[in-house]
């Protein structure tokens, strides 16, 4: 799925117009301080383009966290983002305490030329996602008439619509698909992300290696299935490797992650790999722990020895890392989605860190390396490798759905050209 037939910001006339722009400012916070501003920085080129080309105003809307339709300004306000944005843009940002309604509409109706406005969290209204919880935590659904009113109010805030929220492109939420304006364009971040993935999936450099980690096989079935039609090699690591090893090698896995649902299709996936000539690399040794805890006792195990009862594998061992390094060394293009160990804890981070080092090395020799958002992007931030790989996606779920071969609703909703 590419943007080739969709309107993009560089082709949009913004002069004298009010631009309403969906961005992804869902940034990690600690005590109301932003801990990683990657997503805010990523939206700056689109915002600057509008201002440099004479837009009357740029009204920015985003979600933050999961307030589930309940206003929680103490916990999930976008106000700290306004200050961060001001320093990145070098100009004032007007923060509004809501995202819809008469007061917001008035503030956005006729602002001074070149005004930047940031709306409060879209998800303080249940109409953004269409469902949520009430103040007591009971599940609620938004009424269709109220969803229509919410979307109509958002549509009054601009003359043209730009969507630069790649991280939310896989969600059919009101701000993504429900703004009703004659021109709806993809922003520069959206364009960059889709171009990278389109090229990677439609005309890859070969050998093409996918590195797939993470916990559950069932969550990654479609991903593995779709990628088996595209790649030459695949590393299957992380927690989901144990399901494969138990089914294929009858390995004793102790209390390691095991996915009953996923286990049923392991053999089908392996026979598809064989049919397509895809070389699969699984881990052969492990760093184990006596409980799921940062300070657990640690041990070592191999596929042959098995993992003793009551113990679990939380990282791959050095032999596995060597095998992974060989696969990376053969590749001319790599897509990596999911860590191969519990990288958040020092004792179980070595496998993912050594793999990251190899991917950085591969990049420096000209291999195209794409990091598919989410936890793997967090690894790049943690080890400072964001500018040492070809592309770090800003969207975990969105990049996953692209790699699964799905159409993204947020892209689908843009104007055709």
Swiss-Prot record:
- Where ADP is bound, by residue? 214, 238, 343
What does UniProt say on post-translational modification here? Answer: Phosphorylated at Ser-203 by MAPK1/ERK2 under hypoxic conditions, which promotes its mitochondrial targeting.
Tell me which residues bind AMP.
215-216, 220, 239, 313, 344
Its Enzyme Commission number(s) read 2.7.11.1, 2.7.2.3
Primary localisation category: cytoplasm
What enzyme category does the UniProt record give? Answer: transferase
Against PROSITE patterns, the record matches this protein to: PGLYCERATE_KINASE (PS00111)
ATP-binding among the record's keywords?
yes
Modified positions (Phosphotyrosine) are 76, 196
Q: According to the UniProt record, where is the region Mitochondrial targeting region exposed following cis-trans isomerization by PIN1 and recognized by the TOM complex for mitochondrial translocation of the protein?
A: 38-43
Required cofactor(s): Mg(2+)
List of residues binding ATP? 215, 220, 239, 313, 344, 375-376
The record's subcellular locations are:
Cytoplasm, Cytosol; Mitochondrion matrix
Annotated CDP binding sites? 214, 219, 238, 338, 340, 343
Molecular function GO labels: ATP binding; metal ion binding; phosphoglycerate kinase activity; protein serine kinase activity; protein serine/threonine kinase activity; protein-disulfide reductase [NAD(P)H] activity; transmembrane transporter binding
* Pathway(s) served: Carbohydrate degradation; glycolysis; pyruvate from D-glyceraldehyde 3-phosphate: step 2/5
Assembly, per entry: Monomer. Interacts with kinase MAPK1/ERK2; the interaction is direct, occurs under hypoxic conditions, and promotes its interaction with PIN1. Interacts with peptidyl-prolyl cis-trans isomerase PIN1; the interaction is direct, occurs under hypoxic conditions, and targets the protein to the mitochondrion by promoting interactions with the TOM complex. Interacts with mitochondrial circRNA mcPGK1 (via its 2nd stem-loop); the interaction is direct and targets the protein to the mitochondrion by promoting interactions with the TOM complex.
What's this protein's name? Phosphoglycerate kinase 1
Organism expressing this protein natively: Mus musculus
Whichever gene encodes this chain, its name is: Pgk1
